[in-house]
Amino acid sequence: ELAQAGFTGVWLPPAYKGIDGDRDVGYGVYDLYDLGEFEQKGSVRTKYGTRQQYLRAIAALRAAGLQIYADTVLNHRIGGDAAETARAVPFLQDDRVHPRGESREVEVYTRFTFPGRKGQYSPFEWRWQHFDAVDYDVKTRESGMVYLFDGKQFDDHVSLERGNFAYLMGCDLDFQNEEVRAELLRWGKWYLDTTGVDGFRLDAIKHIAAWFFPNWLDEMTEHAGRELFAAFRATVGSAET
């Protein structure tokens, strides 16, 4: 019916496991490799179903002559499996330029081991070194803060709202880290091979260094051996402006 109505493509929501399991709409990303296959975060399925249901939906759309665009959320991770101790400098959420104190020890949920998946599809595990910043310290439980890890910096070439809007939520990926970039390339190629989607809707691009996605998309296009569609979301300013 969609094709008959003149639609040529469908944008599907984030298909991977979020922190709230089958209640998560997909933007609270926990495990990009779990498309509704593993018992993690209280459920096997995602909000949208199981891996097999997702793949069957893609096949049905393709059979109807429609292209499929996958919502792609690479900016952050949420719902770490264990806490780690690190040192970080505190900033206010609304001011990413002026520190609110000296470097301090923080306890943060930045260790992602994905025990339900047990290394299937990727053995990569996330540690605090793979992130720039977080917004919650178990020790202080303060709200309204951002903690920038020692030796890190907020990404450049991002929105200048709040002085620097690289940090959005959760555990903010460090796109300067070679291991992080390599893992995101590995995931993207796996996702293309697994789903055969025709392109991506890229989330939160104003929070990610502007140089990252052109390089990532070039790699995805080369791997797919065909042109891929790409669109993005970026809200600039406010409703008043």
Roles of regions detected by a PLM:
Residues 1, 177-194:
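Short, acidic/polar
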Residues 1-7:
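A short, Lys/Arg-enriched amphipathic alpha-helix followed by its capping loop at the start of a domain
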Residues 7, 14, 21-36, 57-66, ...:
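Active-site-proximal helices and loops of the catalytic beta/alpha 8
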Residues 16, 74-78, 140, 153-155, ...:
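Active-site-proximal loop/turn and secondary-structure-junction residues that shape catalytic pockets
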Residues 20-21, 151:
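Intrinsically disordered, low-complexity N-terminal regulatory regions
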Residues 23-24, 80-84:
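Short aromatic-enriched loop/helix-cap "lid" or pocket-rim segments at secondary-structure transitions
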Residues 28-51, 79, 166-181, 198-207:
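The substrate-binding groove and active-site-proximal loops of carbohydrate-active enzymes
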Residues 82-181:
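Glycan-binding loop/region signatures in secreted carbohydrate-active enzymes
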